[in-house]
Swiss-Prot record:
Keywords annotated in UniProt: ATP-binding, Ligase, Nucleotide-binding
Family annotation (InterPro entries): GCL_type2/YbdK_subfam, GCS2, Gln_synth/guanido_kin_cat_dom, YbdK
HAMAP family, sorted: Glu_cys_ligase_2
UniProt-recorded Gene Ontology molecular function terms: ATP binding; glutamate-cysteine ligase activity
Family in the record: Belongs to the glutamate--cysteine ligase type 2 family. YbdK subfamily.
Catalytic activity: L-cysteine + L-glutamate + ATP = gamma-L-glutamyl-L-cysteine + ADP + phosphate + H(+)
Pfam families: GCS2
Protein name as it appears in the record: Putative glutamate--cysteine ligase 2
Biological classification of the source: Bacteria, Pseudomonadati, Pseudomonadota, Gammaproteobacteria, Legionellales
Any Gene Ontology biological process: modified amino acid biosynthetic process
Length: 383
């Protein structure tokens, strides 16, 4: 079979998608207001980079393509400013975090687009249960073969990404005792988990065309893999991260993945084999459950190693690529977080323990979401 087209991208160019919670300013619960928000944004600058998600209490911002994490950060701040200005006119707020701590998925409303209606008819309750919030990171690849190699090679590091981004310890009003409860939600979807062990772009093209011919998929979006190729963009898309509490944290995560991807593409240090996936689900569970304090089974070692230690060693290993990309400032901050066992899940638990109030927790998350910005006038603190 002929090859699928793959749009050539600059090596490790970056883009990101961030899904945020739409919050009612009085009750601090999720509120289904994305239709109103999209109408209010109609004539705004960057309108095409702010999009609805499958349920109406979600909103997504998309960066454009960047080589520099700093430039991406500047753009995200501009997008945030537009959201804040628009929110003031319709009395809503936004926050990060992979889950809302006390929302009930049964109360969510599907956004009335043709695509989302079709997905709801196909997946029913799973669609509403997917009212969770993630950061997706795109990494540019020059060729389809590079994309397939990187998709597999980064699978070794998925526990890193889950652990450093974890921000969803509470779900449906309970403490799940997971650092990232969000990362368990999509397991029920078909075509979730990991890409099959396809070794090059030709094998992937053959697989894709068979799945299309069998009417299992219509396009690449029907694959819910943790990491998937995006040939129409010339990228791979990492989909395992919780939405961080701050825009800056999203940049730290992106900067780390960008440098790691460059290291892997340049040095081909991960040897692809089925062994990568023998341990994948267990390692993923360790990161979801325990975060930075989880353990990682590496196939060339005799015993598990702490995820935290593996991240710190990896940062040292890829230092020249971090420096070359100009990401040192962000990685130094990430290194400090990791060595001190700090992620957003730890912070959320700490805030909740102060008052035992989910409403005050959400209010704090809304404030943290604005910590990159000086504009805090929209929020009325709950009594």
């Amino acid at each position: 079979m002929r090859l699928l087209s793959f749009k050539k991208s600059k090596i490790v160019s970056i883009g990101t998608e961030l899904e945020f919670q739409i919050i009612d300013c009085s009750s601090l619960s999720l509120v289904s207001r994305s239709k109103e928000l999209m109408r209010a944004l109609k004539d705004m600058r960057y309108r095409d980079q702010i999009k609805p998600e499958i349920t109406q209490s979600m909103i997504e911002i998309n960066s454009s393509i960047h080589q520099s994490a700093k430039e991406m950060y500047d753009e995200l701040l501009e997008l945030q400013k537009i959201l804040v200005e628009t929110a003031a006119s319709i009395d809503i707020a936004f926050c990060g975090g992979g889950t809302h701590p006390f929302q009930q998925w049964t109360m969510q409303k599907i956004f009335p687009s043709k695509r989302f209606k079709k997905k709801f008819n196909q997946y029913r309750y799973l669609s509403k249960r997917a009212t969770v919030f993630g950061q997706h990171i795109h990494i540019g690849c020059p060729t389809g073969d590079d994309a397939i190699y990187l998709t597999h090679a980064l699978a070794r590091y998925v526990p890193h990404f889950i652990a450093i981004s974890a921000s969803s310890p509470f779900y449906l009003g309970i403490n799940t005792n997971y650092c990232s409860s969000r990362s368990t939600i999509f397991n029920a979807f078909p075509l979730s988990g990991v890409i099959p062990y396809l070794r090059n772009w030709q094998e992937f093209s053959d697989y894709y065309r068979k799945m299309y011919r069998w009417k299992i998929i219509e396009n690449m979006k029907d694959f819910y893999w943790d990491i998937r190729p995006k040939p129409e963009l010339g990228t791979i898309e990492i989909r395992v991260c919780d939405t961080p509490l701050t825009l800056r944290k999203s940049i730290l995560i992106t900067a780390y993945i960008q440098a790691l991807a460059l290291y892997l593409l340049e040095e081909k240090s991960v040897q692809l084999s089925h062994d990568l996936y023998y341990v994948y689900n267990y390692n993923r569970f360790q990161a979801s459950r325990h975060g930075l304090e989880g353990e990682l089974t590496v196939t060339d070692k005799d015993r598990p190693i702490p995820i935290m230690d593996d991240i710190l060693e990896t940062i040292k290993k890829i230092e020249q690529y971090i420096n070359g990309l100009g990401n040192s400032e962000y990685i130094e901050e990430l290194y400090s977080d990791v060595i001190n066992k700090q992620n957003d899940s730890v912070l959320i638990n700490k805030i909740y323990k102060q008052d035992g109030s989910f409403s005050k927790l959400v209010a704090a998350q809304c404030e943290l979401w604005l910590s990159d910005s000086k504009d805090r006038k929209w929020m009325t603190q709950p009594s």
